Amino acid sequence: MTVALLLLMPYGLVGEAAHEWIGMGMFALFVAHHVLNRRWINAVPRGRYTPLRMVQTTLIGLIFLCMVGSMVSGIVLSRHVFAFLPKHGGYELAGKLHILCAFWGFVLMSLHLGMHWNMLLTMARKHLQPSKIRTW
C-alpha cells in the first residue's frame, strides 16, 4: 500500500490513466487490508480505551473517511477506468474533495505507518535473520 500511495502522489509524472489504474490497485489493497484486519475491526467496541488506543482508533477512522472520499471523488473524476459510467457533473467539487482527501490521507497514513514502525521492523528482522531451518 505504501508503494501504491507513493506512486499516486506524483500525478503529473505517472499520467492520468496510470494514476487511475494505480488508484484501483490501492482500492483493492485497501479492501484486502481491511479483510485481513477484520479481527481488529470487530474488537473496536470491546476492551478498555487507553489514550493511545483512542488516538489510533480516531486516526484509523479519519484515514477511512479520506480513503472513501478519495475513492468516490476519483470515480466521479475518472476518464479511463470508469469511463463507462454516465457523467452527471460535480467535477469541481469532486476535484477539490479528491485533493483534500488525498493530501490529508497521505499525512494520516504516514502517522499510522509511523505508529506501527516498530512492529514492522520486528517482523522484518524476524524474516531477514538467518534461521536454522534456512541455513545449511
What are these model-derived regions, one by one?
Residues 1-136:
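Membrane-embedded alpha-helical bundles that constitute the cytochrome b-like, heme-associated redox core
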